[in-house]
């Protein structure tokens, strides 16, 4: 029996790692895989199961932090991590002053974090209490899918900036607003912010990079805060489940993020939107047709 429960923890960690940063909604997948199928509260208890989900989400967050570690070092440290200054040349061929190239800074990330940070502090308990249900998640999945389709179709009419270092503070703030909207479960943080990024004339890779770089600090803070609030529900007997789930989420998070970043400029958003619509149909059949998940 213990082996079966450890296998369930492994599966949940894999699902979390694969879906947390893809624009497919990790919440929707957790409802399908855990709430409707594996039912972690049955072997962990309801509060401990919630803590387990926080722990495996941290695995995904650390995976993203590892992938973008050089970017964070560049934003936080000086020295070899800072881009070198370059000399400018005037029209008459004379060498002018040395200037540093434009680049993404910590201030861009902080500006992007402001909307979701404020909304999370004010309404986190309300969102958790009233919006975490199967019907509301299905609504979020559908709305997010339609927004992704709109973003891809509408943005095809203009050229996109190729480099994340060209992002402006205004773009960062607007993308941050969309991250706040994505606090509706099922909408998908990455789906919302990448879509907004391409609408703001960023290319898909640059929008994805900024999405992940911006998400790590706020997700890390939110996860650690939730973990502190629920620390009393961690039991020594559950530690193996936490370790397996965390490691699975970290490893598969690394694979998922790297694969996604390599593909996003080619496949764009519509394939993910179609997948989300199919997922909604599947969940709806289980929920309305067979009553699976009615107690969620």
UniProtKB/Swiss-Prot annotation:
GO terms for cellular component: plasma membrane. The keyword Zinc-finger does not apply. GO terms for molecular function: undecaprenyl-diphosphatase activity. Keywords: Antibiotic resistance, Cell membrane, Cell shape, Cell wall biogenesis/degradation, Hydrolase, Membrane, Peptidoglycan synthesis, Transmembrane, Transmembrane helix. Belongs to the UppP family. HAMAP family: Undec_diphosphatase. This is Undecaprenyl-diphosphatase.
